[in-house]
Amino acid sequence: MSKTPADNHTPMMRQYFGLKSQHPNQLLFYRMGDFYELFYDDAKRASRLLDITLTARGHSGGIPIPMAGIPYHAAENYIARLVRMGESVVVAEQTGDPATSKGPVERQIARIVTPGTISDEAFLEEKRENLLLSLAHQSRKGLDIFGFSYLDMASGRFCLFEVDGHEALSSELQRLSPREILISEDFPARATLKLEKGISELGPWHFDYESSYRQLIQQFSTKDLSGFGCEAMTAAIASAGALLQYAKDTQRSALPHIQSIMVEHKDDSVLIDGATRRNLEIDINLTGGTSNTLVEVLDKCSTPMGSRLLKRWLHTPIRDLNEIQARQQVVAELQQNQSYNAFEAPLKKVGDLERILSRVALRSARPRDLLRLRFALEAAPEINGLLANATSERLQELNLRILAQPIITETLAKALVENPPSVVRDGGIFAKGYDEELDELLALSTNATDFLAEMERSEKARTGISSLKVGFNRVHGYYIEISRLHSDQAPVEYIRRQTLKNAERFITPELKAFEDKALSAKSKSLAREKELYEALLEQLNEILGELQTTSQALAQLDVLNNFAERANALSFTCPELHNRGGIQIVGGRHPVVESVISEPFVPNDLDLNDKRSLLMITGPNMGGKSTYMRQIALITLLAHTGCFVPAESASISVVDRIFTRMGSSDDLAGGRSTFMVEMTETANILNNASKNSLVLMDEVGRGTSTFDGLSLAWAAVDYLANKLKCYVLFATHYFELTTLADQLENAANVHLTATEYEDEIVFLHKVHEGPASQSYGLQVAQLAGVPRDVIGHAKQKLKELEVVTGIDLDTKTIETKANSSSIKAKTKEHLVKESKNGYQPQQVDMFAQAEQNALKNALEELDLDNMTPLEAISALYKLKSQL
C-alpha cells in the first residue's frame, strides 16, 4: 500500500484508500465499469491465488499502481475460488451515475463475503455445514476456559458451549470443522487452531461480556438469557456476541432467521475426542478423503439438509434414552413393509429448504430459489398424508410440525414462470396475469419485435434497398443498417448513428421515438419486477418461523427414513439401550468393511460386563484385531444415534465417552514423535475415562524399547481395570500381558485366529476365548512382499533367538520353559489393592533377578552399546551355558 500523503493521489485513488482502510485484511473488489479491479497488495495476492495477470495502472503519488482485474460477469466464480481458499472479499459497487458525477463515481461497500458467512448456493458444499466459529478465553480457578459459539449462516442454527483445557479445545475444533474462526488479537491458544487461513482476528473489545450480553438479548427480544440456560457461561456469551455482530456486519442485515440460541451440554452427548474421530473414520478417512467412511455407507438421504443433519448426529451421539428410543420407534415403523419407500419421492421435491429459507431471510434469494421453495411446499401436504396414520409419537409430532402453507404456495404458483432467470436483474420472473401493470409494460417490450419486423419490411419497400436491416444492441440502441455498397442510397431523413467496416447504421425520427418508448417500458418493467419480487420476499418473511419449523421437521424425517432404508438394505437390527451396565453384541459386523470387501464378512460377538470389563486381544497382524475393535466402537456409536446396528442383536449400556488409541504417526508440525503422540493419547484416556466409558487401545508401548513399552502397557491395563473399571478392548503383541487375565478379576483373553495351509497363512478373522498361540509375523512379512532372502535370514535368526530365550519351537507356543525367566513365572503373585486414594498397584517384580552373583556381574560387564548383533548372540549363548 502506498505510504504517500493522500493529497498526492488522484481523487479516485483517495476514494479507494478510504474504502480499503475500513477492511485492511480483506481483498477489495473495486468496481470500475465492466471490471472489478484490485490494487497494490490485493492485486499481487489475487494474481498469485487466481493466476490472473498482474499489471500496472499508471501512477499514484508518483508510484506505479499494481493492478489486477476480473470481468464483473465472472466475479462470482472468482469470489467462490477465493473463499474456498479461506480468503475474505469486500465488494465495492458503483452507486453513482457516471454521467452526472462531477468527481469520481460514488462507490459503496455492497457486500462482504467471508468463508464462514456465505449463504449463496454457488459457494456452499451441498452436504457440509458451513460454520462460523467464535472463541473466547477466560481463566477460572487456574483452568483455561474456552467459550465456543458457532453459526451456520445458511440455516440460522446458532449454538454455544464451554470447555476447559487445550485438549478439549482441539477435540471440539475437529468435531465442528469450521470454515472461519473469530478470535481476539490476544487469544492465548492461537497455536492450537493449526490453521493458516480462515482465521479472523478482532479487537479484544469485540469480546466484551457486557456488550455481548446486550447484543444477544437485543437479537432475541428477551429481558435476559436465563430462558436459554446459558447465564453462567460468560466465556461462551462473550464469543457469541462477537460472532453475532460480525455476522451482522458482513451480511448488512439484522439476521431475522437467527431466532434462538441452543446451549450444548457436555452431559447430553457421548463425548468423542479428536483421535477417536480420526480412527473411526466417521466422515473423513485416515488419508483425508471421504471414501470408505461411515457417512458414505449410511447417507442415502433424499435432501441435502438431511445429509447434513445425519452427519451432525453421527458426530454428536446422544445419551438420552427417551430420545434414542423415540428415534428407534420411528425407524422400526418406517421399516415395516418398507414404507420408507413412499417418502423418497416427496422428500426429493423438498430439496434444500433450509438454505433457501436462509437466503429468503437475508433478502438474497434468487428467483430459482423461490421456484424450489414452491416445490418444497407442494410436497408438504403429500407428506402429511403419508404420516396421517403414523403410530409412533415422534412421527405424529413431526407431522404436526410439517405445516402446509396453501396461501403462499398458491401465490408462488401464480407468480413465477416455469423457468425463471437466475438473477432478478435479468427480468422475466413473473408469469403473465400475475400483475396487470407489469403485463402492460412487458407488452410494449414484446411488441418491439413485431414493430421492428414491420418497419424493416416497409423501409425495404420504400427505399428499394434489399440489404436493409432493422436491429438493436445494448450500446447504440435501435438502428437501420445498410451495407456500405448501398449506403449512398440512404434517404435524406436517415441520420448516421454508427460506421462499421462493411456497413453504415442510421436512425430515423420514427425509430428514435419508438426507442424512447420501448427502452422506458423495459426500464419500468424491470423496476416493477424488482418491486414485486421484494414484496414476495416480505410475504415469505412474515411466516419465516413456521417455514423453518417445517424445514427442521422434514430434515429429521429424512434422516430417520434413511435409517429405516439402511437398516433394511444392510440387515441392521434394533439395539437395546439401557443403564444396567455391560455391552453384549451377537454377530457384530463392521459396516464399512463389509460394504467394500468381496467375500462375506466374518461376524463376531462381544460380552463385556462388570465381571468381565477388559478384554486382552491378541492375534496376528492382519488378523482383524483393529477391525474388531473399531466395529464395536461404531456399533456403540450408531446405537446412541437411534440408528439400527450391524449385528444379529445388541444390548448396550449407555456410555459417556468413546476413546480410541489406534495407530499413530509423527506430529511434525507440533514437534512430537510417534511415541509422544501415542503417550499423549494414552494420557488423555487415563485422565478422562470413567466407569461408563468405552476404551479401545491398540499396541500401546510399541514406539519405545521393548521393556519400556511392556512396562507402560502393563501399568495402563492395570489402571484401566482396577482404577477406572471402564469397558476396555486392549489389543497387544506383548504376549506377556495375557497373564494379567489370571491376576485381574475383571479381565479376560480373546484372540483372532489364523492357520497355515501349504506354507501360507490363512486369516480366519474369528474371535475365540483365550490368548493367541502364535504371531505369524514372518508370514505376514512374506505376504507384504518382503524378499525371500530376507525372510529366510529372518527365520534363521528367529531360531537362534528362540534357543536363547527358551521358546519351544516344536509346539510353536509362546510359553517359556520351566527354567526361563519369563514375566509370567514371576508375576503370579501380582495383586492390586485399594488405598485411601482408591488405587495403589502392588509392586511387581516383572524381570527376574539372577540367582547367582557371578551371572549378575557378567551381565553388568557387557558393553551392549558397542556390541554387534552377532557378538550379542554369542554372549547370550555363553551366559545361558552358565545357568
Curated annotation (Swiss-Prot):
Q: Which CDD domains match?
A: ABC_MutS1
| Annotated keywords | ATP-binding, DNA damage, DNA repair, DNA-binding, Nucleotide-binding
Q: Which GO terms describe its cellular component?
A: cytosol
List, in alphabetical order, the GO biological process terms annotated in this UniProt record: mismatch repair
Q: Which InterPro entries does the record match to this protein?
A: DNA_mismatch_repair_MutS (IPR005748), DNA_mismatch_repair_MutS-lik_N (IPR007695), DNA_mismatch_repair_MutS/MSH (IPR017261), DNA_mismatch_repair_MutS_C (IPR000432), DNA_mismatch_repair_MutS_clamp (IPR007861), DNA_mismatch_repair_MutS_core (IPR007696), DNA_mismatch_repair_MutS_N (IPR016151), DNA_mismatch_repair_MutS_sf (IPR036187)
Q: List the disulfide bonds.
A: none
Q: Name a GO molecular-function annotation.
A: damaged DNA binding
Question: Quick one: which residues bind ATP?
Answer: 619-626
* Keyword Membrane applies: no
Family per similarity comment: Belongs to the DNA mismatch repair MutS family.
Question: What is the stated purpose of this protein?
Answer: This protein is involved in the repair of mismatches in DNA. It is possible that it carries out the mismatch recognition step. This protein has a weak ATPase activity.
> What name has this protein been given in UniProt?
DNA mismatch repair protein MutS
